[in-house]
Amino acid sequence: MDQKQIEEIVRSVMASMGQTAPAPSEAKCATTTCAAPVTSESCALDLGSAEAKVWIGVENPHRADVLTELRRSTVARVCTGRAGPRPRTLALLRFLADHSRSKDTVLKEVPEEWVKAQGLLEVRSEISDKNLYLTRPDMGRRLCAEAVEALKAQCVANPDVQVVISDGLSTDAITVNYEEILPPLMAGLKQAGLKVGTPFFVRYGRVKIEDQIGEILGAKVVILLVGERPGLGQSESLSCYAVYSPRMATTVEADRTCISNIHQGGTPPVEAAAVIVDLAKRMLEQKASGINMTR
């Protein structure tokens, strides 16, 4: 699917919702509007600021304009310079800060108050705490007994599409992107004339947990929005795993269709919502997902 097709899908879904699609320039990475690059090194500089992110550590460059353009075009660690064989102090501090941020988002919990504020039903996997979640991924693939009963009692049965949200390995991915992806996604699915299930939140969930959810609720398509494993400097990336007619015993990873890198610096959440709506419609038409779908 090329950029033009994606933009058409976004316009179509947003139009059906009575909203205006964002201009292409608004969907670009925030780095294009960062502050001008600086070369001075200061311990007082906020390591998370835009100024620190576009800092250039190369001293006396031959073509400063080339470095400036390169630094503005990517969030990668380029143009940081060296102090002999070692990285410069600010470059090292930024590396450590980004590493710390990535660890924090893995270990943080999605606040119960936040889940309640969104009006979501909360269930959990067989995992009871974050440490167990990180060491026993197999238990994160199954719902606890209480969760199974809650879904049977409180969720719509036999939906065309069931949307599930889970913390995964990034709490920030859920809390930061939720408002921009779930409302347009739910509205787009309903505008498409599909029977949409009750969205809910799964604490300590792994990707394969959507198979059990689909089996319990009798959903034709299950869409799981889950926090991605964070990278250095990027802890807000969300993934969508969609699968047609999942079954615990027979569904394999090749049966899933994945849309990753959903965040403001990657695929904008509102754009991803439109693409997911189109994907769900095609899955229902073809009665397939993953490698079994035709382009």
UniProtKB/Swiss-Prot annotation:
One of its GO terms (biological process) is ethanolamine catabolic process. One of its GO terms (molecular function) is cobalamin binding. It is found in: Bacterial microcompartment. Adenosylcob(III)alamin binds at V207, E228, C258. It holds the Pfam family EutC. InterPro entries: EutC (IPR009246), EutC_C (IPR042251). It catalyses: ethanolamine = acetaldehyde + NH4(+). Its cofactor is adenosylcob(III)alamin. It is an enzyme of class 4 (lyase). Pathway: Amine and polyamine degradation; ethanolamine degradation. Binds between the large and small subunits. Keywords: Bacterial microcompartment, Cobalamin, Cobalt, Lyase. Its EC number is 4.3.1.7. One of its GO terms (cellular component) is ethanolamine degradation polyhedral organelle. HAMAP family: EutC. Belongs to the EutC family. NCBIfam families: PRK05465.1. This is Ethanolamine ammonia-lyase small subunit. The lineage of its organism: Bacteria, Pseudomonadati, Pseudomonadota, Gammaproteobacteria, Enterobacterales. The gene is eutC.
